[in-house]
């Protein structure tokens, strides 16, 4: 194993339209097979639709949707004396964003609408209004952490 130390993290450049790193990260997660142009087209169209339906600025609406999906607690498996406990932990801010992006994309892909633009805009609108699959996932995660609060002393 190489001993040169940790590999430096690559800096993600902000996207050209909104000049936002968050948008750039979302587009990168949305992308399939290196087709960034297609991912950008899908995302920007979905954001325009979201802005029309909410009547807010597109970037502000997107950020609010992300904020509504961010988990604050999660459970991690921890082995103690042959038993595995689900230990509730606080989620680091960078992981909160990563999980929310991942969940929004996953739940928009599994929706029933036709075309990714309508799926994504519908999921973002639901997240903006505090409902939908991604918000439900966040609530389930919080519920799991709450149910396993008794094991919080195993935190490391």
UniProtKB/Swiss-Prot annotation:
PROSITE patterns: RIBOSOMAL_S7. InterPro entries: Ribosomal_uS7, Ribosomal_uS7_bac/org-type, Ribosomal_uS7_CS, Ribosomal_uS7_dom, Ribosomal_uS7_dom_sf. CDD domains: uS7_Bacteria (cd14869). It comes from the Bacteria. One of its GO terms (biological process) is translation. Keywords: Ribonucleoprotein, Ribosomal protein, RNA-binding, rRNA-binding, tRNA-binding. GO terms for molecular function: rRNA binding; structural constituent of ribosome; tRNA binding. GO terms for cellular component: small ribosomal subunit. It holds the Pfam family Ribosomal_S7. Part of the 30S ribosomal subunit. Contacts proteins S9 and S11. Belongs to the universal ribosomal protein uS7 family. HAMAP family: Ribosomal_uS7_B. One of the primary rRNA binding proteins, it binds directly to 16S rRNA where it nucleates assembly of the head domain of the 30S subunit. Is located at the subunit interface close to the decoding center, probably blocks exit of the E-site tRNA. This is Small ribosomal subunit protein uS7. The gene is rpsG.
